[in-house]
Regions:
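Long, hydrophobic/aromatic-enriched structural stretches that serve as scaffold segments
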Residues: 36-77
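A short acidic (Asp/Glu
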Residues: 1, 20-21, 72-79
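Short helix-coil junctions and helix-kink-helix linkers
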Residues: 173-189
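A structured, charge-rich N-terminal accessory region that forms the first stable segment of a protein
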Residues: 1-46
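Short, cationic-aromatic polyanion-contact patches
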Residues: 210-225
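A conserved mid-domain beta-alpha-beta active-site/ligand-binding segment of alpha/beta enzyme cores
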Residues: 101-170, 174
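A short, conserved structural fragment
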Residues: 196-211
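A short alpha->loop->secondary-structure connector
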Residues: 5, 79-89
């Protein structure tokens, strides 16, 4: 739309969840399979490795599009920044990057701001601290990215459950809408589905159907009978 020759690449992996202490992709793959019940994450980590390789011989300045209101894009930015050394970088900050359409994104072209040495050091130090903590989740708190435990979203999920049977997908959607209304996009349906399955297996919810499929599973709060 803007008739620009820029090449666009993205991180693929979602560093808002899973182990980050090392760059061993196999550790992340095994974690996603165990905690989230998703197989095939090796393809995601492979694409992220290709993404990083694109910067090895790069001479041109890079413009990074960042949203501090979206955990996945913010975490992905910090992870990327920790790997690219001192290449010149400019930043475009967009509040809701993942749902911004092409017409809206075009309005941000030309508004990039050079990343200062001080800000680069701050972001890199933040990621190093998150790596040391190596928590199961990263979430947004204000404008900061902080560590969180795997149960972080459980109370929100349970607040949308009722004593009537509901599709798992309906509870997940209600929780995502809650994020949307708050203007902070904390996580996606992959993690929320996995947490609902764990809550059901722990007896916090009753269930019927296929716990691994949001549209084939129904949940409700345990009855008092």
């Amino acid at each position: 739309m803007a008739a620009r020759p820029d090449e666009v690449v993205c991180t693929f992996d979602n560093f808002s969840f899973g182990p980050i202490a090392t760059d061993d992709a196999n550790i992340r793959v095994r974690w996603v399979e165990k905690e989230l019940g998703y197989t095939g994450w090796d393809d995601v980590t492979y694409k992220s490795a290709i993404f990083l390789a694109a910067f090895e011989a790069l001479e041109s300045p890079v413009t990074a599009w960042v949203s501090r209101q979206e955990t996945m894009t913010y975490a992905g930015f910090l992870w990327w920044l920790s790997h690219v050394g001192d290449i010149p970088i400019s930043i475009v900050e967009v509040p809701d990057l993942s749902i911004t359409n092409a017409e809206s994104m075009a309005k941000f072209l030309g508004k990039a701001v050079p990343l200062s040495t001080k800000d680069r050091a701050f972001h890199q130090a933040r990621w190093e601290q998150l790596k040391i903590e190596d928590a199961p989740l990263r979430v947004i708190n204000g404008e900061d990215l902080v560590s969180a435990q795997i149960e972080y979203f459980d109370s929100s999920l349970l607040s949308h459950a009722t004593f009537e049977w509901q599709k798992m997908a309906r509870i997940v959607t209600a929780t995502l809408v809650e994020f949307y209304d708050a203007g902070v996009y904390q996580t996606g349906d992959l993690l929320l589905r996995a947490r609902l399955a764990d809550l059901a297996e722990a007896g916090k919810l009753e269930w019927q159907g296929d716990l691994s499929h949001m549209l084939r599973c129904e949940l409700r709060l345990p009855s008092s009978e």
